[in-house]
Amino acid sequence: MTISRSTMAQILDYTLLGPEVTNSELAAFIDSAIELGVGTICVPNSMVNLTAKAQEAGIRVATVAGFPHGKTPALVKAAEARLAVQSGASEVDVVLDIAVVKEGDANRLLQEIVAIREAVPSPVVLKFILETAVVSDEAIVTAVNALIAAGADFAKTSTGFHPAGGATVEAVRVMASASRGRVGIKAAGGVKTWEDAVAFVEAGATRIGTSNAGAILEGAPE
């Protein structure tokens, strides 16, 4: 597969989510995002209101809810998502209750996803994190089908914070096969090089979450 640098840049969700991020670090990150030409930045919920410069440059602003453990009630995640949108976010990456994903409980998944979707209707883009490193392929398929049924926009592999690891090509293939184009697929966690990113796109990813956007794009072929 041949992918241009500019196309890859638009696929990237360039991420800065550490708990210690300062305002000055965020400002430098936004300058970097503009210089790199990425499509989206993903920043802490409390800092969305500081991203006007990125928005003015045409960069989409994403944030997170229920992050990184997913162990808050759905209505709390919904409130987080609503606040993020009010602050200027156009996309929210939500961590599902990973135990429910792991159990393959479609009804409980639907209840959670619908509650959040109703709080932030389309055109806000909702991506739901499955933490694929700790769930079975069967559970991944169940979760993807629930996301489709509930009107989600993306299934996302990982938070990037779980000790079990991040995205794998195999998990992305399972997600893409289940989705058949009905929701986008975001690979995140451990994507560090151009070759990594291309492999995930070839497996079916339509977005790449990474804190390594500069290194990835530096690896683009001439």
Curated annotation (Swiss-Prot):
Protein's pathway: Carbohydrate degradation; 2-deoxy-D-ribose 1-phosphate degradation; D-glyceraldehyde 3-phosphate and acetaldehyde from 2-deoxy-alpha-D-ribose 1-phosphate: step 2/2
A GO cellular component entry from the record: cytoplasm
GO biological process assignments: 2-deoxyribose 1-phosphate catabolic process; carbohydrate catabolic process; deoxyribonucleotide catabolic process
Entry's localization field: Cytoplasm
Signal peptide, first to last residue: none
A Pfam family: DeoC
An MF annotation (GO) of this entry: deoxyribose-phosphate aldolase activity
Class of this enzyme: lyase
Main location: cytoplasm
Enzymatic reactions: 2-deoxy-D-ribose 5-phosphate = D-glyceraldehyde 3-phosphate + acetaldehyde
Keyword terms, alphabetized: Cytoplasm, Lyase, Schiff base
Domain of life: Bacteria
List of catalytic residues: D93, K156, K186
Record-listed E.C. numbers: 4.1.2.4
Family membership: Belongs to the DeoC/FbaB aldolase family. DeoC type 1 subfamily.
HAMAP family: DeoC_type1
Function: Catalyzes a reversible aldol reaction between acetaldehyde and D-glyceraldehyde 3-phosphate to generate 2-deoxy-D-ribose 5-phosphate.
Protein name per its UniProtKB record: Deoxyribose-phosphate aldolase
